[in-house]
Amino acid sequence: MKKIIPALLFSLLLALSAAPADASIWTARETGDYYELIYPVFEGDDPDIKETINTDIYTRASRTADAGRRRYTTSFRYELMMENDRYLSFLFFPGGYEEGAMHGMYAGVGVVYDKTTGVRLPLSHFADVTVSDLVRLQRSGHFYRYNGTPIPVENIQGRPQKVPEDYFINDQGQIFVIFSPYILACFADGVTAIDVTSLGKPGVL
């Protein structure tokens, strides 16, 4: 599978396979022998910004497809966490299933784009976060499943060892750093999140 679809062909494929998800977001689906991709497509007035964002998204999705093989199927899906006039926040879920395994494995990847430039913004753009901050917040009731369900302190199975690059912003302007399954809690808790909104930089959001 090619890593990047040329811009014109990419647009034509999307026109045939996309379905609306939000005012400026479309959902595209691709399937192959060993993969299924469900990913967002950004629509905007500036073609360069649109291409920058969509190329980054598709590159991520295509890596998942390229990992698929006989007896190992892969998938890629997403959730739109927030969109406003300036920012676009997604959670991506690349995963794979080995034939015969008890369950598949997947990761949580959080990305925030600047809609005025197309640039993917680091966590440090919105908040200054340290490992000590994450441990403190996790232990003081700011630990959740990514969907907002609180995780009790007694269910914690690990402590943050580093500040992840992955994060998202929700519709309320809250900032969450995310961790893939098993890192901080059991597999059933899925992708977990620590609310770092209190560390946010004033006036950025």
Residue ranges and their predicted role:
Residues 19-205:
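Compositionally biased intrinsically disordered regions enriched in Thr/Gly
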